[in-house]
Structure formats: structure tokens, C-alpha cells
């Protein structure tokens, strides 16, 4: 999946992967 979709839908990603994604979205 595209990186944009992964950021928009962090729920699909594993909890361990949600942390780095949120870190980029929420500084």
C-alpha cells in the first residue's frame, strides 16, 4: 500500500508500526 494510505489508516498497521507513523504525523 502507498505510504499515504498507511498514514491515513494506522489501524490496519500493527501497534508496533503505529508508533513510528504517529510520531511523524504528530510532532
Curated annotation (Swiss-Prot):
Its induction note reads: Expressed in the early phase and late phase of the viral replicative cycle.
- Cystine bridges: which residues? none
Cite the record's Low complexity compositional bias ranges: 7-21
Q: Where is this region: Disordered?
A: 1-27
Query: In which domain of life is the source organism classified?
Result: Viruses
* Keywords (A to Z) from UniProt: Host nucleus, Late protein, Viral genome packaging, Viral release from host cell
Any remaining note in the record?
All late proteins expressed from the major late promoter are produced by alternative splicing and alternative polyadenylation of the same gene giving rise to non-overlapping ORFs. A leader sequence is present in the N-terminus of all these mRNAs and is recognized by the viral shutoff protein to provide expression although conventional translation via ribosome scanning from the cap has been shut off in the host cell.
The record's family statement is: Belongs to the adenoviridae packaging protein 3 family.
Q: Could you tell me what this protein is called? A: Packaging protein 3
Amino acid at each position: 500500500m502507498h505510504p499515504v494510505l498507511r498514514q491515513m489508516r494506522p489501524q490496519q498497521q500493527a501497534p508496533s508500526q503505529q508508533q513510528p507513523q504517529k510520531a511523524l504525523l504528530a510532532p
